[in-house]
């Protein structure tokens, strides 16, 4: 089909006719990750996802906050609006990272629906107050949501893809520090990584890689009893001046480690 023909075609077909011809709906769904501040929990149980229950939705199932894109509305603003309406959480454009598009013809049994997914990382909020279009909203552990029977549509696939994006951010940026207090120990930082990785990291290897990353963290002449060996206070750190890491920080799963109880290979 020539470029000239396409121009003539779209001059004739009205906006309403084009929408009808396409015959599908465009949604924005958002995956919001946080880390439970309870340091006594296992790292794999601290990663949580913001979910809600739709009025009239499948009984007992959660869904990601999301909805239809309004006319003349940017996708990012749809994400922010729907998260606010359905969970009470306020996001900003800089919080959002696009995950991808999900358009399996069978993803919604009501009609053809295309979802553009976004991901955000936020500190754990004190409470959630849905404004409308939601019967309930809560942060639920990522581990439990790996059971796709708990989620509507293909939202388990979206969450899994979003965690891969989050892991990429942890490898390339200092975003992990947003889940730490202004002063933190190496153990506290390592547990943030372990929460997103969903497996344990060798402490000595973690310390070596982090220490070798220029301007990532700065050691302090202060010590804490948390996150240290018995009788040995742990040194504390603060954030460095660099937002992007000088080198990627990656940690492979050790094949000789025992997989945590209740997990599957899809992590």
Regions found by a protein language model. Give the residues of each.
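N-terminal strand-loop-strand
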Residues: 11, 15-63, 76
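Long, intrinsically disordered, low-complexity Ser/Thr/Pro-rich regulatory/activation regions
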Residues: 219-267
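Short histidine-centered catalytic/ligand-binding loop motif
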Residues: 64-72, 178-179
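Active-site segment of metal-dependent pyrophosphate-handling enzymes
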Residues: 24, 43-48, 76-80, 88-143, ...
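NUDIX/MutT-family hydrolases
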Residues: 119-120, 128-170, 179-187, 205-215, ...
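Short proline/glycine-enriched turn/loop segments at secondary-structure junctions
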Residues: 18-20, 106, 223-229
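Short helix-coil junctions and helix-kink-helix linkers
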Residues: 191-200
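Long, contiguous binding/interaction regions
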Residues: 83
